[in-house]
A protein has these predicted regions:
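Short, amphipathic alpha-helical "recognition" segments used to contact nucleic acids or chromatin
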Residues: 2-14
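Amphipathic alpha-helical transducer elements in NTP-driven molecular machines
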Residues: 4, 17, 34, 38, ...
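Acidic/histidine-rich catalytic cores and adjacent linkers
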Residues: 12, 182-273
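DNA-recognition alpha helix
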Residues: 18-29
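RNase H-like nuclease fold core
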Residues: 27-130, 135, 139, 143-147, ...
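Conserved phosphate-chemistry cores used by DNA topoisomerases
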Residues: 42, 58, 93-96, 109-116, ...
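A short, charged helix-loop
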Residues: 103, 172-176, 180, 184, ...
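Conserved beta-strand -> loop -> alpha-helix junction used to position metal-binding or nucleic-acid-contacting
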Residues: 128-135, 140-176
Length: 273
């Protein structure tokens, strides 16, 4: 019924169960019990799972990956659970949420499982994986997508350098980092990076210099692809915005009773993107 659909939509939109009860009482004069809401959610879960496990067709040269952390109840204790998310760009430029899967944490085993699951559903043609540098991702990409390259998000790279940069020198360092990725060729970017590392050492920012020196190469992969794609494939901003929306929607829930309910609510939002 339309009433049932409204209740499901309220919950999936991030409205708390208590708030749903209050709304139903205000609208219809009687409160809908938590058990009724739970039963309706089970119906919604079937539809969400069908979407989550759908077959993938076509080729996706670029995929963006990230993890969003939510709180869940684990044996009476509360801990974070990571929901791994992937968005693909097809050959015609169309963007699509490829899938989401629960990962206890962002490590090699979780990423490997996630990538293999995507491949089992038909994902192919991957040439570039864009994401933040996190434990095990690079190794998982190499094992599951051996023909693909890895692009470290330059925004996350900058933020990592900023963690060891004094506030008073932040503006200068930002300008220096952006100058690297403003170059027209990878070779020119490497030369600029060397100059930036030297300048940072002269500024007595040895830790920042080391982070740039150690991590810059992973941020330059995009130069191997068409220049008209560079601005889009060198950052994970698209998925970052999506994850912020997920966090906003799930914040009202607080702690999820289990990983399954967290995954369901995340996918309910993703399938309408």
């Amino acid at each position: 019924s339309s009433v049932e659909e409204a209740l499901i939509e309220m919950y999936l939109a991030g409205v708390s169960v208590r708030r749903v009860e209050d709304i139903t009482e205000a609208l219809w004069g009687s409160r809908v019990s938590p058990s009724t809401i739970s039963e309706l959610n089970k119906k919604a879960y079937v539809n969400i799972e069908n979407w989550r496990k759908r077959s993938l067709t076509g080729r996706y040269p670029y995929i963006y990956v990230d993890g969003v952390y939510l709180k869940r109840n684990w044996g009476g204790e509360y801990e974070n659970v990571s929901i791994l998310v992937a968005v693909g760009v097809a050959e015609d430029g169309y963007r699509e949420v490829l899938g989401a899967q629960e990962g206890m944490k962002e490590d090699k085993a979780s990423w490997q499982s996630f990538f293999k699951w995507l491949k089992s559903r038909g994902l192919e043609g991957v040439r570039l994986v864009v994401g933040d540098k996190c434990l095990g991702m690079l190794e998982a990409v190499g094992e599951v997508f051996p023909e693909a390259k890895y692009q470290r998000c330059i925004v996350h790279f900058y933020r990592n350098v900023f963690t060891v940069t004094p506030r008073g020198k932040m503006r200068d360092v930002t300008r220096m980092l952006k100058a690297i990725h403003a170059q027209e060729t990878r070779e020119a970017a490497r030369e600029k990076a060397q100059a930036v590392v030297q300048k940072l050492r002269e500024m007595r920012l040895k830790e920042a210099a080391k982070k740039v020196e150690d991590g810059i190469e992973e941020t330059l992969t995009y130069y191997a692809f068409p220049s008209e794609h560079w601005l889009k494939i060198r950052t994970n901003n698209m998925l970052e915005r999506l994850n912020r929306e997920i966090r906003r929607r799930t914040r009202v829930v607080g702690t999820f009773p289990d990983g399954e309910s967290a995954l369901m609510l995340v996918c309910a939002r993703l399938r309408h993107v």
